[in-house]
């Protein structure tokens, strides 16, 4: 079991500080993190504002990293159910590769663990591209009241069509997009798209969809709304038409209704 802390005094010092919060919670703790004397920080999770976070920390760019762990699951009363295929993390600087010293510290932290580290040079772009798929999947979850088995073929297709549109929008907004890992996987008629079609079908027709997608979407409505609003802010900088995106998004209840449903379920 990994030891964690829920307080961080200015004089506390760690070799590495991993910050794991839902998107939207970070602004409240950034002042505390900024005052701490530790040198190296890794912000883990969905973050549409990596560059802004890096700047707010007021440290050299090579002292701040962003990471994303590909896993899913849910918490029961007495246990945590986890879903993952080869646990690991994609990690890197917001807009530049990590320094050799930083990479060494991260590798040392996971030494001896069966944990794959994938280093990239532009995590701000990577995270935004990640949202290009995550948000349409989220809209589908809400449209189906969390039961992905109810999704129609048309809706499944719209998820990937919307992801392709989102990648095109990001490029128009001058966000770096790795076409091989993103756009080419969502473009209709390509081998990559056929693989993604199979993946989406599997998620919708097996328990993997609940573990990997809908559990998180249904229990993190505030986070998903925060990510949605951030993505809409990016979109406002472009004139790219996103018909599949808009059609799928229009099928979900309003964010206000989703928040009320979440609050009612917690009572």
Where are these regions (language model features)?
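Rossmann-like NAD(P)(H) cofactor-binding subdomain of soluble oxidoreductases
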Residues: 1-80
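NAD(P)-dependent Rossmann-like dehydrogenase/reductase catalytic/cofactor-binding core
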Residues: 171-267
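Flavin-binding catalytic cores
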Residues: 110, 155-180
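Inter-helical turn/loop segments and adjacent helix faces that build the functional surface
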Residues: 114, 118, 146-153, 234-242
């Amino acid at each position: 079991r990994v030891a964690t802390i829920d307080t961080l005094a200015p004089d506390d010092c760690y070799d590495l500080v991993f910050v794991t919060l839902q998107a939207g919670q970070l602004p409240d703790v950034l002042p505390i993190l900024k005052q701490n004397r530790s040198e190296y920080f890794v912000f883990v999770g969905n973050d549409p504002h990596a560059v802004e976070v890096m700047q707010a920390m007021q440290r050299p760019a090579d002292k701040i990293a962003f990471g994303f762990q590909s896993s899913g699951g849910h918490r029961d009363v007495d246990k945590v159910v986890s879903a993952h295929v080869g646990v690991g993390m994609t990690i890197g600087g917001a807009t530049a590769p990590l320094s050799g010293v930083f990479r060494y510290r991260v590798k040392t932290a996971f030494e001896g663990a069966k944990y794959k580290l994938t280093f990239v040079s532009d995590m701000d772009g990577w995270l935004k591209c990640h949202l290009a798929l995550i948000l349409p999947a989220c809209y589908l979850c809400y449209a189906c009241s969390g039961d992905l088995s109810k999704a129609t073929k048309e809706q499944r297709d719209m998820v990937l069509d919307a992801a392709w549109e989102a990648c095109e929008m990001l490029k128009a907004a001058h966000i770096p997009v790795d076409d091989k890992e993103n756009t080419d996987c969502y473009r209709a008629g390509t081998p990559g798209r056929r693989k993604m079609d199979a993946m989406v079908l599997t998620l919708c027709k097996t328990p993997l969809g609940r573990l990997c997608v809908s559990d998180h979407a249904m229990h993190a409505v505030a986070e998903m709304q925060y990510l949605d609003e951030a993505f809409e802010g990016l979109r406002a900088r472009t004139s790219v038409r996103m018909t599949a995106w808009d059609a799928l998004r229009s099928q979900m209840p309003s964010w206000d209704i989703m928040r009320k449903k979440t609050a009612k379920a917690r009572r």
